[in-house]
Amino acid sequence: MASVKLASLIVLFATLGMFLTKNVGAASCNGVCSPFEMPPCGTSACRCIPVGLVIGYCRNPSGVFLRTNDEHPNLCESDADCRKKGSGKFCGHYPNPGIEYGWCFASKSEAEDFFSKITQKDLLKSVSTA
């Protein structure tokens, strides 16, 4: 039951983020996004900075990620980042080629398992069956 509510909330935020970023225009990078959107934030000029594994916020790419990456315990660019932060041993990169960073996992198999289960299609399917 909790996973259905979580999936519903994720889809709501992702949908809201798509509408907010499309209405604002290309010059502004604001709103909620999903790292699984292609391109994230509705334009390749913006970056989706995750605050959770499947949801984030849109920002201009100018230096924001470097500061956020250091502050967030699960964002990573390499396996070494995860080990240094103590958040895991494997940096699982998002399947979206527009996102150059990943999320720390305990192992490669855990990352593969998660990313194979979490896709926009699966989220929408789980919401429609609720």
From Swiss-Prot:
Disulfide bonds join 29-46, 33-48, 41-58. Residues 1-26 form the signal peptide. Keywords: Disulfide bond, Knottin, Seed storage protein, Signal, Storage protein, Toxin. The keyword Signal applies. Residues 64-69, 123-130 form a propeptide. The C-terminal glycine may be removed from PA1b. The presence of a 'disulfide through disulfide knot' structurally defines this protein as a knottin. This is Albumin-1 F. PA1b binds to basic 7S globulin (BG) and stimulates its phosphorylation activity. Involved in the signal transduction system to regulate the growth and differentiation as a hormone peptide. Toxic to various insects through binding to a high affinity binding site in the insect gut. Coiled coil: none annotated. The keyword Signal applies. One of its GO terms (molecular function) is toxin activity.
